[in-house]
Amino acid sequence: MGRAFEYRRASKEARWDKMSKLFPKLAKAIQVAAKEGGTDPDMNPKLRSAIATAKANNMPKDNIDAAIKRASGKDSADIKNIHYEGKAAHGALVIVECMSDNPTRTVANVKAIFSKNGGEVLQNGSLGFMFARKAVFHLEKFAGDLEELELDLIDAGLEELEQNEEELVISGDYTAFGELSSAIEAKGLVLKKAGLEYIPNNPVSFSEEQLSDIEKLLDKLEDDDDVQAVYTNID
């Protein structure tokens, strides 16, 4: 997803009252990370990042602790990562990442959202060559020397570093997530959000009218309780 479009979406979402949906999604991400890699954040970089993302979104500590506790409970839900690919209006490409304890419900909901909003679900694997899987870290702006920071992080797997008026974005290959996460923490950078994202290899520009049509689908997807992230090839 193009950076300009990301910022447009972020500013739009900031105006919406999404906390009632956001906190459960953040809790689910924490629970899955803890279940997959252990409940000790010091030994689990994905859990550390999930916790940092939750804190950056003002999620209460009690909620965070409860999500970690649920992961180690005997009766914890079997939450699965589910991935869907599709097309939106005007041919925009869409990848949807979900976390769900009921895949049957999730696939029915996702297919319905696509079909009712001018899109269609594609066979998984159809868009694999159109996107690159990257470890992406969204951080508070850095006041120091960016060139020096870039050099310091290259050995940890840094591929791209970009700072704008709102934030610093650091990315690398998805396999470097843990190493990059540790290097960023060692530098004392303030994390806002981190995770594995799908970045379009060839972003496409759309008109404002077309974007308005496409966003109807994206909004509905993001509102679904099982949807964790939505990626597009929009520039």
UniProtKB/Swiss-Prot annotation:
| InterPro entries cross-referenced by the UniProt entry | Integrase-like_N, TACO1_YebC-like_2nd/3rd_dom, TACO1_YebC_N, Transcrip_reg_TACO1-like, Transcrip_reg_TACO1-like_dom3, YebC-like
Which Pfam families is this protein grouped with?
Answer: TACO1_YebC_N, Transcrip_reg
Q: Name one GO cellular component term.
A: cytosol
Question: What keywords appear on the UniProt entry?
Answer: Cytoplasm, DNA-binding, Transcription, Transcription regulation
Q: Name one GO molecular function term.
A: DNA binding
Give the GO biological process terms. Answer: regulation of DNA-templated transcription
Matching entries from Gene3D superfamilies are given as: 1.10.10.200, 3.30.70.980
* NCBIfam families cross-referenced by the UniProt entry: PRK12378.1, YebC/PmpR family DNA-binding transcriptional regulator
Name the protein family.
Answer: Belongs to the TACO1 family.
Q: What is this protein called?
A: Probable transcriptional regulatory protein C8J_1116
Q: Kindly list the organism's lineage.
A: Bacteria, Pseudomonadati, Campylobacterota, Epsilonproteobacteria, Campylobacterales
